[in-house]
């Protein structure tokens, strides 16, 4: 068919605006944006015709549907709830630690109006946003003072900028870590104006390495916990107690970046020992930073606890305002920390900790329940319960997995990866993994309502 004839078959703007399904978007986005979407689609259609990609007359119904889908994409939120069936509890790409529904309701109540974010109700004048949780952090960790910024990378940057600018920071070569997004300790040091002074080797660093490195230019000793990897074998590192003693002797602050950070021991759940924030403070670290949305089980935040004289310097630094947390984060962090006043409440009410604490038998029961729900439907799958291993994620416990059970689906009619891809396009996307041509639904990261959604949505495939 002649290109000019095909171009003439394209409906004009007014004809398309008369379509009810297209016109109903006008109230939501306005006539200008509506016309812009239609115009963009028409330009794409014309371009395809000119380039020879389309050889037939334009199907008007298909064109209208194409426009409607573009309008839906514009008007519907891009960020949405997904179901995490991967078994990775602190899945970075899926938002890390979930916030409990009870906390969300309290945050919603506060966020839908005004709040006392920076207002002291007792004294009737301006207050500090840290006041809602700093005493809690001190009570829980044994620190003298506390604050929070928007993530742990920001916390490290602030500590270095406020205490180490144009000074040397001594760090073991084995602790020059990189986390996701190519965030590297040396790069953060350069940005902060701190001069990196490496000591030791990749696998071994001794106390005398630190001692020999101290000069008049030394501003701090930085201890970085390698929470997202481990060096094993012929290794040695210096404990924080010995570094803290050296720092006190030489009058140099000792900073500890814990990365994930944890307030409760996880050893009883089959995980190796991870240094707690309390242990670092008791060992004598002057400042300790850690994440809010990893093993703490709260919102994204970079928490700093330690000596008051150093926290006072940090709070007055210009970067603090640029890195400060917002009211929603402050509220979520306070609610999260209050759960730790009784550790049993934290394990029961914080979703991430609750998932970690699940026993293998707990997951077996959940997997059996999900399988039974699936078997009641006429689905083209062979369904079984199989052993599996779940990951903590979020750069925590890199060598440790949690044993449990998963619901396993086998489909002979379709490729496993094709089904997994289709599940990610469902109204409530289900994120799972394909392993040996089987779909693995790890129930450790599923709530009961998630299972109900999975069963309902698998019928749509």
List where the protein language model places each region:
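Short Gly/Ser/Thr- and Asp/Glu-enriched loop/turn motifs at secondary-structure junctions
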Residues: 10-11, 83-87, 296-299, 402, ...
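Glycine-rich phosphate-binding segment of PLP-dependent enzymes
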Residues: 43, 85-86, 96-122
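Conserved PLP-enzyme active-site core in the AAT-like
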Residues: 123-340, 375, 457
């Amino acid at each position: 068919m002649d290109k000019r004839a095909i171009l003439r078959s394209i409906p004009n703007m007014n004809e398309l605006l008369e379509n009810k399904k297209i016109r109903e978007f006008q109230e939501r986005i306005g006539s200008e944006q509506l016309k812009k979407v239609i115009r963009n689609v028409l330009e794409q259609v014309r371009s395809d015709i000119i380039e020879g990609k389309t050889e037939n007359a334009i199907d008007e119904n298909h064109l209208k549907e194409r426009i409607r889908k573009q309008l839906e994409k514009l008007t519907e939120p891009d960020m949405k709830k997904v179901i995490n069936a991967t078994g990775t509890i602190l899945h970075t790409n899926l938002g890390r630690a979930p916030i409990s529904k009870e906390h969300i309701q309290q945050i919603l109540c506060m966020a839908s109006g005004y709040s006392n974010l920076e207002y002291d109700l007792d004294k009737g004048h301006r207050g500090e946003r840290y006041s809602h949780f700093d005493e809690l952090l001190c009570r829980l960790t044994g620190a003298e003072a506390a604050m929070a910024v928007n993530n742990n990378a920001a916390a490290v940057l602030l500590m270095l900028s406020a205490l180490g600018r144009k000074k040397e920071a001594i760090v073991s070569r084995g602790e020059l870590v990189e986390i996701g997004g190519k965030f590297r300790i040396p790069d953060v040091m350069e940005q902060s104006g701190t001069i990196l002074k490496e000591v030791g080797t990749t696998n071994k660093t001794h106390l005398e390495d630190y001692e020999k490195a101290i000069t008049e230019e030394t501003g701090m000793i930085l201890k970085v916990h390698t929470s997202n990897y481990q060096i094993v074998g012929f290794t040695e590192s210096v404990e924080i107690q010995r570094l803290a003693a050296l720092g006190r002797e030489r009058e140099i602050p000792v900073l500890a970046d814990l990365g994930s950070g944890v307030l409760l021991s996880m050893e009883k759940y089959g995980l190796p020992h991870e240094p707690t924030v309390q242990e670092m403070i008791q060992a004598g670290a002057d400042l300790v930073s850690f994440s809010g949305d990893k093993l703490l089980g709260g919102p994204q935040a970079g928490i700093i606890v330690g000596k008051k004289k150093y926290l006072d310097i940090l709070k007055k630094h210009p970067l603090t305002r640029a890195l400060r947390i917002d009211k929603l984060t402050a509220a979520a962090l306070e609610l999260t920390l209050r759960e730790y006043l009784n550790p049993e409440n934290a394990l029961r009410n914080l979703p991430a900790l609750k998932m970690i604490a699940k026993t293998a038998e707990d997951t077996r029961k959940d997997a059996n329940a999900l399988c039974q729900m699936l078997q009641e439907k006429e689905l083209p799958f062979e369904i079984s319960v199989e052993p599996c291993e779940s990951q903590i994620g979020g750069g925590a416990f890199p060598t440790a997995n949690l044993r449990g059970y998963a619901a396993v689906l086998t489909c002979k009619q379709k490729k496993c990866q094709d089904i997994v891809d289709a599940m990610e396009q469902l109204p409530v996307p289900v994120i799972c993994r394909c392993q040996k041509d089987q779909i693995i639904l790890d129930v450790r990261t599923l709530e009961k309502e998630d299972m109900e959604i999975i069963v309902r949505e698998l019928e749509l495939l």
